[in-house]
Amino acid sequence: MNLVAALVLCFALLSSVRGDDTTNTIDHDQVKPFPQPEPVTISEKAAVKYKPQLEIGDGCVSFPAVNAAGEITGGLKGTKDTEACTEAPLGSQVYGRSTWFQDKWAMMYSWYFPKNFCAYKAAGRHDWANVVIWIDNPAAENVTFLGASLSQQTLEPIKLAILPMGTRNEEPYQNQKAIPMMAFAGAERITTGRVGRWSYTYKYVAGSNTTMRFSHSYPGTWGWIDMTFADSDGESQDLIMWNQLTDKARAALESADFGDTQVPFTDKNFDTNLQAAWPF
């Protein structure tokens, strides 16, 4: 092959790769979410019945990450705080996947955010967060909630001068077998009296027996934004299960590069994450 032919071939290959990237990545606010299908199987019905609410305590609202054609969100540069991500104009999405894991039924719910946040400011492009809800049997009319595992980022905190703004999480999940009453939608804490200058008495009103509520917010310390239990109700998004996605959407999520964060429910990540989320 002469030099000219080699250069032409290289240019064609580079153009092909560049064209594929452009075709498969679109603006974060142009990704159309999947409508929630009517559940058919036992696992789909359970996933819809126990779909949690998401409250946005800090950072961006959740956005869809992929459309039916397999086009992936390009996210947003980690600057300018919540600019361009306070509302998902086409609607949001929660992604689900469930399975038996050892002798428990695991339901993973995942959300995508176009910016990541650390130390109360935008600090990166892309963020995936998820929770795993553990129950005894998806076919039961009234299930027993066995635990909940909330994802947390294990990245090194950003630094101000030479000081890290927070501490690094050692584990990718906060795993809990005891689920607080206030973690359920509709639950209330009502102040009933005052017993000191800063002390009060409360009564608690139970909420839903099917729907939990989680918050995407800072967990009370400096560091990266994470999943926490919410004390107030959030919103529900259309749920799409892994096996309900189009083939193109699944393939795109499997191969997409989301930088420092990963799609938690893909074939290459799902089992590993369930192992890390195991609270028993």
From Swiss-Prot:
Glycosylation sites: 142, 209
Span of the signal peptide: 1-19
Chain positions of motif Hepta-peptide GHRHDWE motif: 123-129
InterPro entries cross-referenced by the UniProt entry: NPP1 (IPR008701)
Claim: Amino-acid biosynthesis is one of the keywords in the record: no
Record flagged with keyword Signal: yes
GO cellular component terms, A-Z: extracellular region
Cellular location(s): Secreted
Keywords, ordered alphabetically: Glycoprotein, Secreted, Signal, Virulence
Pfam families: NPP1
Domain of life: Eukaryota
Residues that span the membrane, as ranges: none
Coiled-coil positions: none
PANTHER family for this protein: DOMAIN PROTEIN, PUTATIVE (AFU_ORTHOLOGUE AFUA_5G00600)-RELATED (PTHR33657:SF8)
Domain comment, as recorded: Key residues/motif important for the effector activities are degenerated in most NLPs, including the nlp24 peptide consisting of the conserved region I (11-aa immunogenic part) and conserved region II (the heptapeptide GHRHDWE motif) that is important for phytotoxic activity.
Family that this chain belongs to: Belongs to the Necrosis inducing protein (NPP1) family.
Protein role: Secreted effector that contributes strongly to virulence during infection by P.capsici.
UniProt name for this protein: NLP effector protein Pc553546
Organism: Phytophthora capsici
